[in-house]
């Protein structure tokens, strides 16, 4: 009788994905973030489910229902802070996962990469809608500012914004809609993650050298299952430290003030993980131009497979490309810092320089450096 894990229709899918999966023997800790993202998604779905049991999506009671969760529900404060900080951990893992993909040339797996970019958009949409739900000052004004960006679309913009608002301002209708979408999107993300894995397992994982590793593969379990478990424990340690000791570190104090349409906060800004894109948006004086730059700053990831000019896949043996990759990372940190600063000199100028540098490195410098490195290989 054959082993049940290899013959059972359902169990063999799990077996081929997590147990007998042939994995390159030299993948480093940078390959842990895929499983950590799955771990984060599970935490978010479970905590979100319990929060949804007590939350009410009505403008009159949304803020007080969150207060009620924190004060009166058993361990409600823990569930709420795990969910809020879980989003931050999700994005940290996501950015590191994308950074790994860019550095080691994983984007040459075209389908896997494009599904990944769609996943990034879905996660960003979910996080934005979730930020609106507590109905604090930043929730309300963030929703107003971001939804208002759609009015930059020619001809249909204003109609589109009023359609999303269900009226002439952000009120009960968008809050209820955002709650509905915020609830359903994580399940769509889970389905997309499965498609992401399906495409990945068609080709097998990339590895730090960027070379074909068919001749040197080992089973996923126990080698990498243990490695992933260690990664999950380290993530959990950092995560619970954040939740239990400094739960409001990454939040905005303005969100502890109930939403008031008559009182605008001095600095409207999104959560930290959107600040880089927000800085790019603010760097362009024209509204439509800013919106296009904002969208393209994420969509540009889809161009990486086309912009790859090097004969080598990974940046592991390309010191010039490495140099500009890390300049790009530093530039993203700069944009994140600028996004949280007021719109005044010198922050506007720094933001504009950083935005130009971001697009220049990706579209011009990295492909050019790759071509130069190809020449140096012959030399």
Swiss-Prot record:
Belongs to the cytochrome b family. Heme b b562 binds at residues 83, 182. One of its GO terms (biological process) is mitochondrial electron transport, ubiquinol to cytochrome c. GO terms for cellular component: mitochondrial inner membrane; respiratory chain complex III. Its cofactor is heme b. The keyword Cell division does not apply. Heme b b566 binds at residues 97, 196. The chain crosses the membrane at residues 33-53, 77-98, 113-133, 178-198, 226-246, 288-308, 320-340, 347-367. One of its GO terms (molecular function) is metal ion binding. Pfam families: Cytochrom_B_C, Cytochrome_B. InterPro entries: Cyt_b/b6_C, Cyt_b/b6_C_sf, Cyt_b/b6_N, Cytb/b6-like_sf, Cytochrome_b, Cytochrome_b_C_euk/bac, Cytochrome_b_N_euk/bac, Di-haem_cyt_TM. A ubiquinone binds at residue 201. It is a multi-pass membrane protein. Component of the ubiquinol-cytochrome c reductase complex (complex III or cytochrome b-c1 complex) that is part of the mitochondrial respiratory chain. The b-c1 complex mediates electron transfer from ubiquinol to cytochrome c. Contributes to the generation of a proton gradient across the mitochondrial membrane that is then used for ATP synthesis. Binds 2 heme b groups non-covalently. The lineage of its organism: Eukaryota, Metazoa, Chordata, Craniata, Vertebrata. Keywords: Electron transport, Heme, Iron, Membrane, Metal-binding, Mitochondrion, Mitochondrion inner membrane, Respiratory chain, Transmembrane, Transmembrane helix, Transport, Ubiquinone. Heme 1 (or BL or b562) is low-potential and absorbs at about 562 nm, and heme 2 (or BH or b566) is high-potential and absorbs at about 566 nm. Disulfide bonds: none annotated. It is found in: Mitochondrion inner membrane. SUPFAM superfamilies: a domain/subunit of cytochrome bc1 complex (Ubiquinol-cytochrome c reductase) (SSF81648), Transmembrane di-heme cytochromes (SSF81342). This is Cytochrome b. It comes from the Eukaryota. The cytochrome bc1 complex contains 11 subunits: 3 respiratory subunits (MT-CYB, CYC1 and UQCRFS1), 2 core proteins (UQCRC1 and UQCRC2) and 6 low-molecular weight proteins (UQCRH/QCR6, UQCRB/QCR7, UQCRQ/QCR8, UQCR10/QCR9, UQCR11/QCR10 and a cleavage product of UQCRFS1). This cytochrome bc1 complex then forms a dimer.
């Amino acid at each position: 009788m054959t082993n049940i894990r290899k013959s059972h229709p359902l169990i063999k899918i799990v077996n081929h994905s997590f147990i007998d999966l042939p994995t390159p023997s030299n993948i480093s800790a940078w390959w842990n973030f895929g499983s950590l993202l799955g771990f984060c998604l599970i935490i978010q779905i479970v905590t979100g489910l319990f929060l949804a049991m007590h939350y009410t999506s009505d403008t009159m009671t949304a803020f007080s229902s969150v207060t009620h969760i924190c004060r009166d529900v058993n361990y409600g404060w823990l569930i709420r802070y795990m969910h809020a900080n879980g989003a931050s951990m999700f994005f940290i893992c996501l950015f590191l996962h994308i950074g790994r993909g860019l550095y080691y040339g994983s984007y040459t797996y075209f389908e896997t990469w494009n599904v990944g970019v769609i996943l990034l958009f879905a996660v960003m949409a979910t996080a934005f809608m979730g930020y609106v739900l507590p109905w604090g000052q930043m929730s309300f004004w963030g929703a107003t500012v971001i939804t208002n960006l759609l009015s930059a679309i020619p001809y249909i913009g204003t109609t589109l914004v009023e359609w999303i608002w269900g009226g002439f301002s952000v009120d009960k209708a968008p809050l209820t809609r955002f709650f509905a979408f915020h609830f359903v999107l994580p399940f769509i993300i889970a389905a997309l993650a499965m498609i992401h894995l399906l495409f990945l397992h068609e080709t097998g994982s990339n590895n730090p050298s960027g070379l074909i590793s068919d001749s040197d593969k080992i089973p996923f379990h126990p080698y990498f299952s243990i490695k992933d478990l260690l990664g999950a424990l380290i993530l959990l340690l950092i995560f619970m430290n954040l939740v239990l000791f400094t739960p409001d570190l990454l939040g905005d104090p303005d969100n502890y003030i109930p939403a008031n349409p008559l009182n605008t906060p001095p600095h409207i800004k999104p959560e930290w993980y959107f600040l880089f894109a927000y800085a790019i948006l603010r760097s362009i004086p024209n509204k439509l131009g800013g919106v296009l730059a904002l969208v393209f700053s994420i969509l540009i990831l889809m161009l990486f497979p086309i912009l790859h000019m090097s004969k080598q896949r990974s940046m592991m043996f390309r010191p010039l490309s490495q140099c500009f990759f890390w300049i790009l990372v530093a530039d993203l940190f700069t944009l994140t810092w600028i996004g949280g600063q007021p719109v005044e000199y010198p922050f506007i100028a720094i933001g504009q320089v950083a935005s130009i540098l971001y697009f220049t490195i990706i579209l011009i410098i990295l492909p050019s450096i790759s071509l130069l490195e190809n020449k140096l290989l012959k030399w």
